[in-house]
């Protein structure tokens, strides 16, 4: 079996977390992590355009096979939810243009896959990302670490789906 390049995305309006890993057999390795940031003083349409254009550059540079994105699960602030929803829209558009399938995960699913516990702390998840990917330090900012965690979750979930499918 060949390798699988997974793009993890922690969607946001101000900061989009990006994490890319490669799965080859039983080995999962770190490829890249970073963020796409938009200044608060830019109008909404320019912020969304920047997210879209920068995200397309990531897709073209790293050619992921699949994308794992955090679901918009629960937010306390409606304004924040609207901005994140708009950002998700342009991210989905870019992924659709490149024919990259998207898999969505709730935050507690990501936590369970990295810690075995759906209410693990952010710090615990970040430490596990560092350890599992053999990184010298926790990826910064938090959004990038979260994106790597989402990618890791998908790697485990897709492996489980393949094993289940092979048994059928």
From Swiss-Prot:
InterPro entries reported for this sequence: RNaseH-like_sf, RNaseH_sf, X-over_junc_endoDNase_Mg_BS, X-over_junc_endoDNase_RuvC
Known partners and oligomeric status: Homodimer which binds Holliday junction (HJ) DNA. The HJ becomes 2-fold symmetrical on binding to RuvC with unstacked arms; it has a different conformation from HJ DNA in complex with RuvA. In the full resolvosome a probable DNA-RuvA(4)-RuvB(12)-RuvC(2) complex forms which resolves the HJ.
Protein name: Crossover junction endodeoxyribonuclease RuvC
SUPFAM superfamilies: Ribonuclease H-like
Cytoplasm listed as a keyword: yes
Cofactor note: Binds 2 Mg(2+) ion per subunit.
Protein task: The RuvA-RuvB-RuvC complex processes Holliday junction (HJ) DNA during genetic recombination and DNA repair. Endonuclease that resolves HJ intermediates. Cleaves cruciform DNA by making single-stranded nicks across the HJ at symmetrical positions within the homologous arms, yielding a 5'-phosphate and a 3'-hydroxyl group; requires a central core of homology in the junction. The consensus cleavage sequence is 5'-(A/T)TT(C/G)-3'. Cleavage occurs on the 3'-side of the TT dinucleotide at the point of strand exchange.
Molecular function via GO: crossover junction DNA endonuclease activity; DNA binding; magnesium ion binding
Organism: Thermotoga maritima (strain ATCC 43589 / DSM 3109 / JCM 10099 / NBRC 100826 / MSB8)
């Amino acid at each position: 079996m060949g390798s699988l390049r997974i793009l993890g995305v922690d969607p946001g309006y101000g900061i989009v977390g990006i994490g890319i890993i490669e799965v080859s057999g039983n080995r999962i390795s770190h490829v890249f992590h970073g963020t796409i940031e938009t200044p608060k003083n830019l109008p909404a349409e320019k912020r969304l355009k920047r997210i879209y254009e920068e995200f397309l550059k990531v897709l073209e540079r790293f050619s992921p096979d699949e994308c794992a994105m955090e679901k918009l699960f629960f937010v306390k602030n409606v304004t924040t939810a609207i901005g994140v929803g708009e950002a998700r829209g342009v991210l989905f558009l870019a992924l659709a243009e490149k024919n990259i399938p998207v898999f969505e995960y709730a935050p507690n699913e990501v936590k369970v896959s990295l810690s075995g516990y759906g209410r693990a702390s952010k710090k615990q998840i970040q430490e596990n990302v560092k350890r599992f990917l053999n990184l010298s330090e926790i990826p910064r900012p938090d959004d990038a670490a979260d994106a790597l965690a989402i990618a890791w979750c998908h790697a485990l979930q897709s492996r489980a789906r393949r094993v289940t499918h092979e048994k059928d």
